[in-house]
Design a protein with these regions (language model features):
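Extended, histidine- and acidic-residue-enriched regions that form the cofactor-binding/catalytic faces
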Residues: 1-108
Length: 108
């Protein structure tokens, strides 16, 4: 994005936000998938992973990938995930994306 903007291109970068200790296959991701009725979600198989904040593990994650920081590949705790939480997260993400695009479009 920085390079594109330096080249004079009007671009927007947006990514969904969440808790720093729940960043991959944890409560948030699993709840979102449940809200979308994803057939691959098996809560009976859900188990907690590493729940350290992302800033605490980011260097190891960049060096060695997910396996370097979490034996089961989970960064968070999906065991209490549910579709209602997932729907609320999707609503929040949608609102923040629409707001970001609206603000970005005003600058054009």
């Amino acid at each position: 994005v920085r390079t594109l903007r330096a080249e004079g291109r009007n671009v927007l970068a947006w990514s969904p936000t969440g808790r720093a200790d729940d960043t991959h296959a944890g409560h948030i991701d699993t709840s979102v998938l449940l809200s979308l009725a994803h057939p691959g979600v098996d809560l009976a198989a859900a188990e907690p992973g590493v729940t350290l904040p992302l800033p605490d593990i980011i260097d190891d994650l960049r060096r060695g990938g997910l396996a370097a920081v979490s034996p089961n590949g989970v960064l968070g705790d999906p065991t209490h995930a549910n579709a209602d939480d997932g729907a609320a997260v999707l609503d929040r993400w949608t609102d923040t994306l629409v707001a970001a695009v609206t603000e970005w479009a005003r600058r054009d």
